């Protein structure tokens, strides 16, 4: 049986990296992207920050006001989630193109906007040296097409691949083959094991289990009596680098979209619709290549003041036609145009509620 090979791709400080790419004047500065509550200028929490900001002790989840105290010179920006999602969609398409051909999405698993697993067992022929070459190709393509970096972990399962991607951040690649997994895992603090939170780590410490090696060599009966059969067994297996969990894309959670900049800032409906039609065509092409239908249509506009607005329509049935997509997009765009006095700079369309086609191609009854 061929040796399983899994890649975990983790985009480096994703939101902040996109902002640096879009605004080159930010390079060399501490950049903090905040999920703002709107109550005051910096009320809210840090969504992500670049590595320069991290040198000042700024971390995700921290109140923005505290981050400001740690580095008053940092550049604070609001989250532009719709825009980041559109970038993510393109990156996920790149990653899917490298995954093994699989049925029912069992060779690709997107776990967040900036992370995904892909199985390359057959593409790499079970060879970790070839897997490394494929990993380097992925990094090169993402850099060329999106001007962003990622960190990659390659291992015999999801657990090892996920942990390997954290070993050389940012912009690194780490390969952990089966014969090297103990050398990689065992020296680590047990709190570094993927799936172990603060509460479990504290309990393990109370049991004098400090490293992953300590956990791997600990009596499984005692682990089961402390954590229960399922959790105790999992802890023992994880510390030994055992993980048989499959890759599975959750139906309905994925979205496919495109966003682009208009030739000029405008409120001209024909000009905007012309671009929307092209973007919709690209989206339908991606859907057709994977035999998917959709149920949710979302249009995003970014105005000349760089404010982002989105509206969605949920259809009565899953559909897969460009005409239906455009019909919904036109309606949403008309609403935007009737409400806005500020010209649009960028426009995008995306679809969600994805599922495998079941024969129907066009349903206008929504």
Curated annotation (Swiss-Prot):
Is Ligase among the key words of this record? no
Q: Which CDD domains match?
A: PolY_Pol_IV_kappa
Which positions are catalytic residues? Answer: 115
Q: What is its EC number?
A: 2.7.7.7
Spell out the reaction equation it catalyses. Answer: DNA(n) + a 2'-deoxyribonucleoside 5'-triphosphate = DNA(n+1) + diphosphate
Choose any GO biological process term that the UniProt entry carries and state it.
DNA-templated DNA replication
Q: Which residues form the signal peptide?
A: none
Q: Any keyword Thylakoid?
A: no
UmuC domain span: 6-197
The protein's matches in InterPro entries, at most eight in alphabetical order, are given as:
DNA/RNA_pol_sf (IPR043502), DNA_pol_Y-fam_lit_finger_sf (IPR036775), DNA_pol_Y-fam_little_finger (IPR017961), DNA_polymerase-Y (IPR050116), DNApol_IV (IPR022880), PolY_HhH_motif (IPR024728), Rev_trsase/Diguanyl_cyclase (IPR043128), UmuC (IPR001126)
Q: GO terms for CC?
A: cytoplasm
Which UniProt key words apply to this protein?
A: Cytoplasm, DNA damage, DNA repair, DNA replication, DNA-binding, DNA-directed DNA polymerase, Magnesium, Metal-binding, Mutator protein, Nucleotidyltransferase, Transferase
Chief location category = cytoplasm
Q: Which Gene3D superfamilies match?
A: 3.30.70.270, 3.40.1170.60, 5' to 3' exonuclease, C-terminal subdomain, DNA polymerase, Y-family, little finger domain
Q: Which PROSITE patterns match?
A: UMUC
Q: Which residues are marked as site: Substrate discrimination?
A: 15
List, in alphabetical order, the Gene Ontology terms for molecular function in this entry: damaged DNA binding; DNA-directed DNA polymerase activity; magnesium ion binding
**Required cofactor(s):** Mg(2+)
Function recorded in the entry = Poorly processive, error-prone DNA polymerase involved in untargeted mutagenesis. Copies undamaged DNA at stalled replication forks, which arise in vivo from mismatched or misaligned primer ends. These misaligned primers can be extended by PolIV. Exhibits no 3'-5' exonuclease (proofreading) activity. May be involved in translesional synthesis.
Give the similarity note: Belongs to the DNA polymerase type-Y family.
Assembly information from the UniProt record = Monomer.
Give the protein's recorded name.
DNA polymerase IV
């Amino acid at each position: 049986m061929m040796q399983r090979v899994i890649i975990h791709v983790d985009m480096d400080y994703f939101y902040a990296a996109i902002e640096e790419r879009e605004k080159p004047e930010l390079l060399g500065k501490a950049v903090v992207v905040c999920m703002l509550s709107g109550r005051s200028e910096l009320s809210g929490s840090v969504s992500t920050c670049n590595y320069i900001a991290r040198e000042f002790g700024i971390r995700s989840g921290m109140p923005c006001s505290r981050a400001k105290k740690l580095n008053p010179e940092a550049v604070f920006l609001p989250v532009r989630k719709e825009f980041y999602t559109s970038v993510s969609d393109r990156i996920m398409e790149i990653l899917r193109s490298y995954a093994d051909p699989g049925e029912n999405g069992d060779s690709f698993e997107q776990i967040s906007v900036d992370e995904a697993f892909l199985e390359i067992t057959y593409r790499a022929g079970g060879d970790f040296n070839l897997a490394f070459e494929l990993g380097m190709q992925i990094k090169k393509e993402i850099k060329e097409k999106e001007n962003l970096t990622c960190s990659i972990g390659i291992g015999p399962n999801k657990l090892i691949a996920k942990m390997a991607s954290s070993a050389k951040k940012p912009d690194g690649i780490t390969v952990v083959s089966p014969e090297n997994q103990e050398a990689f895992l065992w020296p680590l603090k047990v709190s570094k094991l993927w799936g172990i939170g603060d509460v479990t780590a504290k309990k393990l410490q109370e049991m004098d289990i400090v490293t992953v090696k300590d956990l791997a060599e600990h009596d499984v009966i005692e682990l089961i009596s402390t954590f229960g059969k399922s959790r105790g067994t999992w802890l023992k297996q994880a510390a030994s680098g055992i993980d048989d969990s499959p890759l599975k894309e959750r139906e309905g959670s994925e979205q496919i979209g495109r966003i682009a900049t208009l030739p000029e800032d405008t409120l001209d409906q024909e000009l905007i619709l012309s671009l929307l039609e092209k973007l919709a065509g690209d989206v339908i092409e991606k859907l057709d290549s994977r035999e998917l239908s959709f149920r949710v249509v979302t249009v995003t506009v970014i105005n000349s003041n760089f404010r982002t607005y989105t509206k969605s329509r949920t259809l009565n049935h899953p559909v897969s036609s460009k005409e239906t997509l455009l019909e919904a997009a036109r309606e949403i765009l008309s609403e935007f145009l009737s409400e806005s006095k500020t010209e649009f700079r960028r426009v995008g369309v995306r679809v969600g509620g994805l599922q495998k086609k079941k024969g129907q191609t066009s349903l206008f009854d929504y």
